[in-house]
A protein has these predicted regions:
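Non-cytoplasmic
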Residues: 109, 162-201
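Alpha-helical membrane-interface segments at transmembrane helix boundaries
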Residues: 33-49, 72, 76-82, 95, ...
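Cytoplasmic-entry segments and transmembrane alpha-helices of multi-pass inner-membrane transporters
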Residues: 61-94, 109, 117-127, 134
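Transmembrane alpha-helices
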Residues: 48, 111, 143-177
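Loop-to-helix entry region at the N-terminal start of transmembrane alpha-helices
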Residues: 38-47, 91-116, 200
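Internal alpha-helical transmembrane segments of multipass membrane proteins
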Residues: 48-64
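Periplasmic/extracellular loop-to-transmembrane helix junction in inner-membrane transport proteins
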Residues: 6-7, 14-52
Length: 201
């Protein structure tokens, strides 16, 4: 049976929540999809912001430092070192620096997303045939023009592959961002664990 289009379970949960007899943090069925949509939107925002920053910074650093072997190796080493820090520890390290919320979460996700992008860009540029660079020099291209018109277009397939890998890392790690108040799909998990509410989880 249903009441005004609502199932009995929905009506009962709403009445209990209104009366303060049920956990207000556990969404009733009518609220489930709206909360899920909100958490999903925040999760996507965190991921896209981090990927955008990592893409711009990672590709730019790789392009600038690629001619210098030691600097490029140092960049890869630092990015790899960041990957060894546990996700929750890196998020916790952000708190004394920039507080809690979206900003520290985006910074942490950005740092995690750097390695695949930098590595893919450096690998792609190093694999470019020298003849293309020779032709660019013969045409009188400046260093910036050579990067923009030769290196980036030829390296783009590898860069996109690096971005895909970074996206997988960011999407997974963004779940933990809820522990520092950034929201996202990890929010109901964190709240459910804190309240010992398996229904919410």
């Amino acid at each position: 049976a249903a009441l005004d289009g609502e199932g009995i379970a929905t009506v009962a949960a709403s009445v209990l929540a209104t009366a303060g007899l049920a956990n207000a943090n556990t969404p009733v069925p009518s609220q489930f999809w709206s909360r899920l949509a909100g958490n999903t939107a925040r999760h996507i925002q965190l991921t896209l912001a981090a990927l955008l920053l990592a893409g711009v910074v990672g590709v730019s650093l790789a392009l600038v430092l690629q001619p210098f072997a030691r600097a490029a190796s140092a960049l890869l080493y630092v990015c790899g070192l960041l990957q060894t820090i546990p996700s929750i520890a890196l998020l916790a390290l952000m708190i004394p620096l920039v507080g809690i919320g979206v900003v520290p979460a985006v910074i942490a996700l950005f740092l995690y997303a750097l390695l695949p992008i930098v590595r893919a860009t450096l690998t792609a540029i190093n694999a470019i045939e020298p003849v293309y660079l020779t032709v660019a020099d013969a045409l009188g291209m400046t260093a910036s023009e050579r990067r923009r018109h030769v290196l980036v277009p030829l390296a783009m397939p590898h860069i996109i592959a690096g971005l895909r890998t970074a996206a997988v890392i960011a999407i997974g790690t963004a779940t933990l961002a809820a522990f520092i108040g950034a929201g996202g799909l990890g929010q109901p998990i964190v709240t459910g664990l804190a309240l010992n509410d398996t229904g919410l989880i």
